[in-house]
Structures are given as C-alpha cells and as structure tokens.
C-alpha cells in the first residue's frame, strides 16, 4: 500500500466545488454501462478524450492503455494496486480537480469505477460483513495534520480512491528512516495512522468500500478501496509522545444519520448533505 498522504476536503468545499465532479463520476457506479464490455467502454472514452484534449503526454497515456489487455476487472485492479502510472497520477488529478483536468478523470477514473462496481456486484464476499475496521498509514504535512485536528467531529471526504487494509497496522512498525527514503520525508512531515470504523448497514456513502485483495498485486495487504468522495467523520486523535517511529492515530468512522444530527443545523449541513446525496442516487 502506498504511503503517500491524502488531503481531505471539507463538506463546504465538497458542496461548493467538488460535488459536480462527484455527480459525473457517480454514473459509473450505476447500471448505465452495465451491458458494455470493459474494453468497449475504454475505447469509447479514450477516443472522446483524445479528440477533446490538448495535453502533450498522449503517447504516455496510450502506452498505459495498452497495459489493459482486454479490459478485464483483474487487469484494472492489478494496474491500480501495482507500482504503475495509474495509481499515482489518477489520485493526483482527483485531489486537484478542475474543469480542464476532468477530461483525464472521465477517461481514467470512469472505467476503473465501473470495473469496481461490476466486481462488487459479482462478488458475494462484498456483502458478507456488516462492519469492519480498516487501517491506513501515511505521511502528511504538518499543516495538513493541523487540519485534521481542527476538524474533529466534522464530516470530511477524500476526492481520490482511498486504499485501506484490514491488517491491524498498530502491530507493525513503520521505520522513519525507510519512510524518509521512500517519500522524501522532511522535518515538516508527520506519520499518521488512520483507523476507520466501517459500518456498511448504517453508512451514508453512495458506494461501499470494495475488497480487491483477490486480484491485487499485493494480496497479502488485504486491501479495500473506498471510491472517490467517500465521506468519513473524524472522531478523535491520539498523539504519540514516545518513539519517533510511532504514528499519531486518527480515529474515523463512516457517517450515519446520528452523525448528521450532531452537525450544526444553523449551517444547513444536514439538509444540504441529504439533498446532494439524493441527487447522486437519482443520477
């Protein structure tokens, strides 16, 4: 699992700026394209992308597309979970969305979202559990860590695909020197561990997290992927004062109706969230 940090966005930023992208992406988590083959969908989106784009790295994109041999869900997952162009570039674009770059998102994130949707619907294992605990260790800037601290009790979301693991990472060390070599960590960076309490029965997210360990390049990590714009509630933070290798722990959970009722109704968050979510479901 990559240990590159993910920036979250607040509910206000989501509703004011990112919601329109989420709505466009949400259609791929529906049955709209259910009868299309993966390679047909890629061909359709790719041609549209090439015809409308003015980017200079088309050759690089074409080379990436050729790695998806027949557009099977296995290949989508392997390319994403491996050390490839897709994982890093796709999430980088998703974290910095604007109207111009959405051409990329439609091409890359759309078919991958669609593949995950098909995989989840065809895999009975997705519905076996009602609740789980997921973990994600990552390195973030101190300034971003401060945003987590002031957002305790708030609803946040990640605009990128969020990889987590069912492995209890509190039992594993995370050497600072190795992390520095991999991610070029500086004195202005900090290591954190997200512990996410996931309840699929009460969860208000549009789409569930999806287990991809069966086809993942790192199957031993028991990887689960949360789709873009999945919402979480920051419950509390436990700061470690011991070894520098110990991460600060950020406790989070998937939102439910009780969480929404705790919001400041004067700001209209509960009403606005439900309205946006209903629009997504009807798209």
Specify the residue positions occupied by each region the protein language model found.
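Mono-ADP-ribosyltransferase
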Residues: 1-283
